[in-house]
Curated annotation (Swiss-Prot):
Source organism of the structure: Orientia tsutsugamushi (strain Ikeda)
GO BP: translation
Keywords on record: Ribonucleoprotein, Ribosomal protein
Underlying gene: rpmF
GO CC aspect terms: large ribosomal subunit
Pfam families the UniProt entry points to: Ribosomal_L32p
A GO MF label: structural constituent of ribosome
Keyword Iron-sulfur part of the UniProt annotation: no
Listed NCBIfam families: rpmF_bact (TIGR01031)
Official protein name in the record: Large ribosomal subunit protein bL32
Similarity comment text for this entry: Belongs to the bacterial ribosomal protein bL32 family.
Length: 68
């Protein structure tokens, strides 16, 4: 089995773990609704991004329920 020759110091251990930190999420408040959302993402309540409507509401216009 592989066994280290020397003990790893606390400093070396902490330097190795310095990249394990969690990144902070960039959350902003929506200008229209005041809800929190991720920046550079579509507002899911209205389907808007940068003031433009990008997600349309899918309303089923057919009243066929396939009940035969």
């Amino acid at each position: 089995m592989a066994v280290p020759k020397k003990r790893t110091s606390a400093s070396k251990t902490r330097m190795r773990r310095s990249h394990h930190a969690l990144a902070k999420v960039n959350v902003i408040t929506d200008a229209k609704t005041g809800e929190y959302r991720l920046s550079h993402h579509v507002c899911m309540t209205h389907g808007t991004y940068n003031g433009r409507k990008v997600i349309t509401d899918n309303v089923n216009t057919n009243d066929n329920n396939n009940n035969s």
